[in-house]
Regions:
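Glycine-rich oxoanion-binding loops at beta->alpha junctions
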Residues: 2-7, 54-109, 118, 161, ...
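N-terminal phosphate-binding or glycine-rich loops at protein starts, especially the Walker A/P-loop
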Residues: 2-58, 396-443
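Short glycine-rich or small-residue beta-strand-to-loop segments that form or flank ligand, phosphate
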Residues: 13-21, 78-83, 107-113, 156, ...
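Short, ordered loop/turn segments at secondary-structure junctions
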Residues: 19-22, 47-53, 84-85, 114-116, ...
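Short glycine/serine/threonine-rich phosphate/pyrophosphate-binding segments
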Residues: 23-33, 54-55, 89-95, 115-122, ...
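Accessory alpha-helical/coil subdomains and C-terminal extensions
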Residues: 44, 111-113, 119-153, 171-290, ...
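C-terminal non-catalytic interaction/assembly regions of soluble proteins
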Residues: 272-396, 640-754
Length: 754
């Protein structure tokens, strides 16, 4: 165990532990905590085996160095171990934990775990002063140590695949678990369709339906059962079977039911997946397969999102602790709208307890309310999408002819957005029209009606089934488009795509005086891997591309480390460096080159020298990630040749241009969910504007976690005309975090040696 620092020259010591069920991304959090603490001049300690290690002390509390957390960001589980500790639930156990922290000189603690672990941390904070007095009284700790550490400062990080922790949009591990579930359900779907078979899939989540609900939304499941909203009638088995039977009647070849492990009926009785299977077999008179995914949801490498989430939260937690003043309450460090936020831990625990109380008393409306608006919206959307057939049109409700076009480079999630728009629109009584091959299809009148079943199976399909291209409209094109709109009686237009889609929509808006056919609701939904559109923090397709990059780079690293190589990896993004920066953070790259920051020869020379120095000290791998347009002169091959020549005899150099694999693949769960969410909101906006005498044009986006519509008129002023990227890019604020993680060692040590 560490010796406490001398009081007169006290160095802050930060401890980190992972507790409860493991979650992918915990290693990235540990790495961020350790490196941020060291970089700020503090000492870092890992408490092995969770809260139990805190009780046992001794070798369970170990000092960490910079290299102690090298090459762990891509690993699943937690390298410092975790455990559920029954002893910590006792006062005597917490007293031992307090003594061990005091004797190690640790009064700042980062706890990565679920609600049980965070509740335990809150209790330890509350009891600290009294336990301190008891330890002084029985001589377990010296008086000097007790005087130096009168308070315990705690930062909790939400680490749970269940995503059941209030105070954060999503917890560490939940996105990775969704990847496991959607991959499994996608695979099951292909065999189910081959045999025209029904499947029941049970997913984790305990008493939270997040994983079940979001995986149902992402996979296009036909029915879902979650704890927060049980079936509101007793004969739910017959209703579920009827919906699945109707789906087969209209042409579906398979049926998929997703069941949360905590599912219940409206009386609070558990609904097991085996009970669902038996009900389907009874009412459908067919053989039904049951798959319980189990711990495959918890294991494996973390997704790109979880790696970056954990890094951001771990860094923010240490920053908070090092600036904590006397009297600072324990805080949960979570994410809201892509920004780290802190919330008093006791408030988060109180909300979690309120949700549990609401569910135990069968107040499910209250439970849904406490889960948040995004959860409620997702549930309402799923209820529409699982229908075998749409509702009958409502009397008196205006019915519109809404055209949909995909434009720009292909982005995973385009098909998901189109599917959601078509089914939600038809369910509202509208007629949906598909325009083939992007804006060229508008010019050539390549329009056809889309039905409920036209988009069957599109939820998980990559690419763009309607066809897309990057064509920019010329002045002569508008008259042809006006003729198409008149011939097809187009009364609203939804454009799903990138820069060319936004340019087209803005052009149509400007042409309204000349062509009255364009005086209709115009809405753009951001879908591009480049994430270079205004009005939205993230575009559909970006998360999938980022995961494609991270998967490829993980493999490249395994190859490079065996041969002591420097790898220069080029990623897409045009003039926007989002993919480069976020993939660099997620893969642990040493350097990232962005067009926003520029690249010069002096920097490249410094990078060569730093790499050579590292390899001489037994470094095994150098990873450099560059945006494709970061510098036209110092391109990827130039950098490769430079590093190869200057590193001769010390390291080898190779380059990899990842290319169009970044655009391919089935959409990630995040892209599927956001595409569905945004498309649904677009349909609401279109109907609202369709009632106006002069309908507006807008582009939708997620900004700071909220869905917002921005007037199309603002599009040119929000874009840089030269680079065709937004003037404001929120993610650049994360560059210092990535750079601090990528250093060869802490700046505090470098400064001390000067």
């Amino acid at each position: 165990m560490a010796k406490p620092p001398a009081a007169e020259n006290q160095v802050m010591r930060v401890g980190v532990l992972t507790s409860g069920g493991d979650a992918p991304g915990m290693n990235a959090a540990v790495r961020a905590v350790v490196r941020t603490a060291l970089d700020r001049g503090a000492e870092a300690y890992a408490i092995y085996e969770g809260l139990q290690g805190l009780i046992e002390g001794g070798t369970s509390i170990r000092q960490m160095q910079w290299d102690s957390v090298s090459s762990i960001i891509q690993k699943g589980g937690t390298i410092i171990g975790t455990a559920r500790s029954a002893e910590f639930l006792t006062r005597s156990g917490r007293k031992r934990a307090t003594a061990n922290l005091l004797n190690a000189g640790i009064d700042r603690l980062v706890v990565v775990g679920g609600d049980g672990s965070l509740t335990g941390a809150q209790l330890l904070y509350t009891e600290w002063p009294e336990l301190l007095r008891e330890l002084l009284a029985d001589g377990s700790v010296p008086a000097g140590i007790a005087a130096s550490f009168p308070e315990l400062f705690i930062a909790g990080l939400p680490g749970s695949i269940d995503n059941d922790i209030p105070g954060t949009d999503i917890s560490i591990g939940a996105d990775s678990a969704l990847h496991r579930i959607t991959n499994a359900v996608d695979a099951i779907t292909s065999t189910a369709a081959s045999h025209q078979r029904s499947f029941v899939v049970e997913v984790m989540g305990r008493s939270c339906g997040y994983l079940a609900l979001m995986s149902a939304l992402a996979t296009g499941a036909d029915w879902v059962l979650i704890p927060e909203s049980p079936p509101n009638f007793d004969a739910w088995q017959q209703k579920m079977s009827s919906v699945l039977r109707d789906g087969r009647t209209i042409g579906r070849r398979d049926s998929m039911v997703i069941v949360a492990e905590g599912a219940r009926d409206r009386h609070g009785n558990p609904i097991s997946s085996s009970e669902v299977k038996a009900a389907l077999e009874e009412h459908l008179q067919e053989e039904v397969r049951l798959t319980i995914l189990g711990h495959v949801q918890r294991g494996g490498a973390p997704s790109a999102f979880d790696r970056n989430l954990s890094t951001i939260l771990g860094s923010a937690a240490v920053t908070h602790l090092l600036h904590a003043q006397p009297g600072t309450l324990p805080q949960l460090v979570g994410i809201r709208g892509n920004r780290a936020v802190i919330t008093p831990l006791h408030e988060c625990i109180g909300t979690a307890q309120a949700i549990a109380a609401a569910m135990n008393s069968a107040d499910y409306a209250r439970a849904m309310e406490l889960r948040g608006s995004s959860f409620r919206d997702a549930f309402r959307t799923v209820r529409t999408l699982v229908r075998a057939l749409p509702h009958a049109p409502q009397p008196g409700r205006r019915q519109l002819r809404i055209a949909i076009v995909t434009s720009g480079g292909a982005a995973a999630g385009m098909n998901t957005a189109v599917r959601a728009a078509v089914r939600v629109g038809i369910d509202q009584g509208h007629t949906l029209l598909g325009i083939a091959d992007g804006v060229q299809g508008m010019i050539e009148n390549r329009v056809s009606e889309l039905t409920w079943m036209s988009v069957n199976g599109w939820a998980h399909m990559g690419g763009a089934e309607l066809g897309t291209n990057r064509k920019l409209l010329a002045a002569a094109d508008y008259a042809a488009i006006a003729r198409t709109f008149a011939a097809q009686n187009v009364q609203a237009l939804l454009l799903v795509g990138g820069y060319s889609a936004y340019r087209a929509a803005h052009g149509l808006l400007q042409q309204r005086a000349t062509h009255p056919e364009f005086r209709i609701p115009l809405v753009c939904l951001p879908a591009t891997i480049d994430n270079d559109l205004p009005g939205s923090d993230l575009s559909i397709g970006t998360d999938t591309a980022l995961n494609n990059i991270v998967d490829a780079v993980d493999k490249i690293k395994q190859s490079a480390v065996a041969s002591r190589r420097v790898m220069v990896v080029e990623v897409m993004g045009r003039y926007c460096g989002y993919l480069a920066l976020m993939s660099a953070m997620a893969t642990g790259a040493e350097r990232v080159y962005l067009h926003e920051q520029g690249v010069n020869l002096a920097e490249l020379q410094a990078d060569v020298q730093a790499l050579a120095s590292g390899f001489k000290q037994d470094k095994k791998l150098g990873l450099l990630i560059r945006n494709e347009y970061c510098n036209a002169v110092y391109d990827t091959r130039f950098m490769w040749r430079l590093f190869a020549e200057e590193g001769r005899g010390v390291f080898e150099a190779r380059y990899a241009i990842l290319g169009h694999l970044q655009q391919g693949g089935d959409p990630s769960p995040f892209d599927r969910i956001q595409a569905t969410r945004l498309a649904t909101k677009c349909l609401d906006y279109i109907y609202e504007q369709g009632q106006q005498a002069e309908p507006a044009g807008a582009f939708i986006g997620l900004r700071a976690g909220q869905v917002q519509f921005t007037p199309l008129e603002q599009f040119p002023s929000m874009m840089d005309a030269v680079t065709a990227r937004p003037r404001e890019q929120w993610w650049l604020a994360l560059l210092p975090v990535m750079q601090s993680m990528a250093q060869a060692g802490p700046r505090s040590a470098q400064n001390a040696s000067l």
